[in-house]
Amino acid sequence: MDYKETLILPDTSFPMRGNLPANEPHTYAKWRDEKLYSKLKNAHSGAKNFCLHDGPPYANGHLHIGHALNKILKDIIVKYHYFKGENIRYTPGWDCHGLPIEQQVEQKIGKAKKDNLNKTKLRELCRNHAQKFIQIQSDEFQALGVLGDFENPYKTMDFAFEAQIYRSLIELVKEGLLAERSKPIYWSWACETALADAEVEYQDKQSDSIFVAFTLSDSALQSLGISQGKVIIWTTTPWTLPANVGIALNPSESYVLTDKGYIVAKALLEKVCENIDIGISKREFKAQEFERLEAINPLNGRTSLIVLGEHVSINDGTGAVHTAPGHGEDDYYIGLKYGLEVIMPVDDRGNFSPLIESMGLVPKEFANEFVGKNIFDTHESIFKILGKALLKQDVITHSYPHCWRSHKPVIYRATAQWFILLDKPFYQGKTLKELALEELDKVRFYPQNGKNRIYSMIENRPDWCISRQRDWGVPIAFLIDKITNVALLDEAVLEHIACIFEKEGCDAWWSYEIKDLLPPSHKHLAENLTKSKHILDVWFDSGSTWSAVLENEYKGAGNNYDAGSHPADMYLEGSDQHRGWFQSSLLLSCAIAKRAPYKQILTHGFTFDRNGEKMSKSKGNVISPSEIIKTQGSEILRLWVALSHYQSDQNISDEILKQVGEQYRKIRNTIRFLLANASQNSQDMVEKDELDVIDRWILSVCDRVFDEAYEYFDEYEFAKAFQVVMSFLINELSGIYLDLCKDILYCDDVSSLRRRAIQSALVMILRRVLHFIAPVLTYTADEAFRHSSAALKGEYESIFDLPKLSCAQGYNLEINEDFTRLLRVREKFTESLDNLKKQKIVKSSLEVLLQSPQEKEFALLDRWLIVSGVCGKECKDKEELARFMLEDKEEFVIYRAQNGRCERCWQFIVEESEGKLCKRCTSVIAQTKK
């Protein structure tokens, strides 16, 4: 007889292979058809809310692996809160304005055609480009298994959204937090236009390199207690010296006065002496001793304030940087800190204006050598005026920014820009900066050091320049008085314009006549007004998303999103957003709503190849999410995210994904075994107190492990959660429990109590496993649930209905036995058995008996160690194979089993009189025949 046919072997329709690339799209289509996200939104109404507000990706290009990491993390967290029983909201969004889209349009139609287009047509082309990639990216995000309100996403270019961005600007006007002032930007004097960073390319350029001595003022000499002192500066832009108002020193450095009266950074003294003989060190000072003292500009005799700046390099130069806030970004920001004057004597064409004469920026007798002359053509005149203060002049070749259109060198030039004031008291005597820092103290950060990053950035940041000189964006729609050049900030006018934007979008700013932008009460002013040419910084757009998307008192009509309330429970982005979206959102929310827009901030690192290098097409090391999905399935990518310590930078490669695939197969195979052996119907489940002690042990371990894992989930430490769960699945569950249950599952009668007890335990474990993996391996959990028995499903229709159930809720898990000791017994026994196998003395644990000193655990050890029997002293006449001892000196002896092997269960327990089968197997077969 073939006894194999009498065994109850595992049986499940759940396939061993997931065939994920083929099956995932069908499952997602089913979810979409069922309007699953809408169901999830409504499933826990009335419960605790959890709203993750989506940081909008840019609507340009396909997704890269960083996008995948970000969106999968968000999806895991939203789903985790859903499976916790919370009322979740997640509305995806897109950032639609900005220079990259303008560039793409120009590349497509050509610069000449773009320059001849009217603004409305150009913006239409930009809008179409953005919409195209929103659809592409939406499909790609959903292919990652991400659930959200993709039917009603937010787009910053929607008319109502543009109106809301503009209304945020109006709120700042009301708070008195806007100011117009000059700020240096890249300027192409050859094209007479401002340039964005992306429009600047670096080329080698020959420049004059000069060392100039600024004599300290009498009061400065007195303060320092010295009789003479000249601070040496080094610059490669001599034409900026007329606009000098300061000298910046590095606050972390020491400075020396030489015996010849010159002052340079101590660290650079030797290097400077290679160029100029300035003598040897005579006295040393801390940089702070010079702060706010004055020196004299030798070009024009004007005072130059000594300031401290972290930007001052100690790698080259003198450690003292000539500072002209109108001609440099670092100079400008340090100027804001110290209140330095912004002087701009250069016109649109790169020529010195009459201002250079009227302000006395050069000696009057030399003015005609400057006014109307190109700045680069005035160096010889500058050298002549400097005289002996010019310590050395040379020519160097260095990398210098050039205009991408004219290929001429660009300059930094201060122009009128709009700013949000951070240091002006506006609310309960607090400045915006103070309020923002105060609100940050209420925010929970993951990781915690993220708080220090954004805190120090805001603490040290200057006022926020929100104006840009581009076409594709939300206009700073202010009407300017032609005579006074002052903006008309009347609330009725601003609100009237906002209403127009709400209906027709902000393209109306360019297409409408000024009179049509004014309310009836102000139309008489039209002839005296002109339109501002600025648009808003795109960070203002994304920083306003909370006001347009989340429920709040400032939300305008037309922004109909069911996305949760302000403040959001979480913002989650890459660590670079401490400088970006987290900061812009915080500042605008504090300015308008007087509170932070988020309760928690979670950040992740960046993704690199296996060698830690940045991915690029030229290196051939790009790993595309779409390729992974096509070849391996998004589940592998999702598990990679969950297993990664994502708060740091992450590496990804085919080899790493292969390792992740192996982890996935372990999880899938465990689920498959559980499905194949668990109870089929609820009536097969045993009663609360009918579990065997080993079943109670595994369920108590299961509860402990998953409770610990959920604690890690609560802190968003998914890798640690999976580590403890994987250890349980591999060691306690598969390595011990499932192994020792196989005999009962396969060989006992189908209705035996102990078999049904194991099957009941497997149902409880499977529920916990599926509930745990569902936020991460949603496709797999969904598939497994569909292949589950009625016993597991119970009253639930889908995996998304499955609640978090502990094993202790279903069964009495009280244990009196010492399983810590039993695990040590098993460990020692396994070591001895492995040695016996290596020596080819036995092939299986079923070939041995064990002598135990404690009679009460004979029956337990029999099953626990998968041996053919446990005995006391009566075993001594058997063939001894090995012995082992516990730490407490308890000794166990391993003997060879003497009885015959049962041909059905393979245990060596058949007496000579019993034939080929043991008593249990004989009884089961007899029952089967009935």
Swiss-Prot record:
Residues binding Zn(2+), per UniProt: 902, 905, 918, 921
Cofactor note (record): Binds 1 zinc ion per subunit.
Coiled-coil residue spans: none
Annotated residues for binding of L-isoleucyl-5'-AMP: 573
Names of the cofactor(s): Zn(2+)
Any single biological process term in GO: isoleucyl-tRNA aminoacylation
Broadest EC class assigned to this enzyme: ligase
Short sequence motif 'HIGH' region: positions: 57-67
Pfam families: Anticodon_1, tRNA-synt_1
Entry keyword set: Aminoacyl-tRNA synthetase, ATP-binding, Cytoplasm, Ligase, Metal-binding, Nucleotide-binding, Protein biosynthesis, Zinc
Location, primary (coarse class): cytoplasm
Reaction equation(s) it catalyzes: tRNA(Ile) + L-isoleucine + ATP = L-isoleucyl-tRNA(Ile) + AMP + diphosphate
Entry's Gene Ontology cellular component terms: cytosol
Binding site residues for ATP: 617
Positions occupied by motif 'KMSKS' region: 614-618
Locations listed in the record: Cytoplasm
Domain of life: Bacteria
NCBIfam families reported for this sequence: ileS
UniProt remark on domains: IleRS has two distinct active sites: one for aminoacylation and one for editing. The misactivated valine is translocated from the active site to the editing site, which sterically excludes the correctly activated isoleucine. The single editing site contains two valyl binding pockets, one specific for each substrate (Val-AMP or Val-tRNA(Ile)).
Subunit structure: Monomer.
Recorded family membership: Belongs to the class-I aminoacyl-tRNA synthetase family. IleS type 1 subfamily.
PANTHER family (UniProt xref): ISOLEUCINE--TRNA LIGASE, MITOCHONDRIAL, SOLEUCYL-TRNA SYNTHETASE
Job description of the protein: Catalyzes the attachment of isoleucine to tRNA(Ile). As IleRS can inadvertently accommodate and process structurally similar amino acids such as valine, to avoid such errors it has two additional distinct tRNA(Ile)-dependent editing activities. One activity is designated as 'pretransfer' editing and involves the hydrolysis of activated Val-AMP. The other activity is designated 'posttransfer' editing and involves deacylation of mischarged Val-tRNA(Ile).
Designated name of the protein: Isoleucine--tRNA ligase
Provenance organism: Helicobacter hepaticus (strain ATCC 51449 / 3B1)
Taxonomy of the source species: Bacteria, Pseudomonadati, Campylobacterota, Epsilonproteobacteria, Campylobacterales
